[in-house]
């Protein structure tokens, strides 16, 4: 039995579930759909949602489906947040509407169009706070922004996740000045 798959999902107040071809989760932050694989069923009772599987052949997707459903429930009720830091002299970000502009040491500023459902707030031009209700989309947008200027292993300059621990490499030793 999948340990993750057999855990019930608590449904907060204000979250509505509709099971059909897909699991439709609606809440105060929006609406998400989760695909239901073959052999997986949902049972709703006492403010909880349980994921059941028809046989052990469907064990591979049992835990996955439960995790996706739990992320959808949490997303439409509380939402998700991802934070990034920009480190480097002259590196900064600005946002106007749904377009984020990054100055990252290249010869040109880089513009990123934020998808629907992802909001970006910028504190002090170097701290980004991404918020949204779809965990997968939010993580992908954060990864795309980080990929614009990954942290340099020698000076640790670039865009990193807040709290990310980076290993700094040692530079050349022979050519250093006295």
From Swiss-Prot:
GO terms for cellular component: cytosolic large ribosomal subunit. Keywords: Ribonucleoprotein, Ribosomal protein, RNA-binding, rRNA-binding. GO terms for molecular function: rRNA binding; structural constituent of ribosome. GO terms for biological process: cytoplasmic translation. PANTHER family: 60S/50S RIBOSOMAL PROTEIN L6/L9 (PTHR11655), LARGE RIBOSOMAL SUBUNIT PROTEIN UL6M (PTHR11655:SF14). Part of the 50S ribosomal subunit. This protein binds to the 23S rRNA, and is important in its secondary structure. It is located near the subunit interface in the base of the L7/L12 stalk, and near the tRNA binding site of the peptidyltransferase center. Belongs to the universal ribosomal protein uL6 family. This is Large ribosomal subunit protein uL6. It comes from Solibacter usitatus (strain Ellin6076). The gene is rplF.
């Amino acid at each position: 039995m999948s340990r993750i798959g057999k855990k019930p999902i608590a449904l907060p107040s204000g979250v509505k579930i509709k099971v059909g071809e897909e699991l439709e989760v609606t809440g105060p932050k929006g609406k998400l759909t989760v695909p239901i694989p073959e052999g997986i069923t949902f049972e709703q009772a006492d403010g909880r949602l349980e994921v059941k599987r028809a046989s052990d052949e469907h064990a591979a997707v049992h835990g996955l489906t439960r995790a996706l459903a739990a992320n959808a429930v949490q997303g439409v009720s509380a939402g998700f947040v991802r934070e990034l830091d920009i480190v480097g002299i002259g590196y900064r970000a600005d946002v106007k509407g749904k377009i984020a502009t990054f100055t990252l040491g290249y010869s040109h500023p880089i513009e990123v169009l934020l998808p629907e459902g992802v909001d970006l707030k910028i504190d002090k031009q170097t701290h980004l706070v991404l918020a949204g209700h779809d965990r997968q989309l939010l993580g992908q947008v954060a990864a795309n922004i980080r990929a614009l200027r990954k942290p340099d292993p020698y000076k640790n300059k670039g865009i990193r996740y807040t709290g990310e621990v980076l290993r700094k490499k040692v530079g050349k030793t022979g050519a250093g000045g006295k």
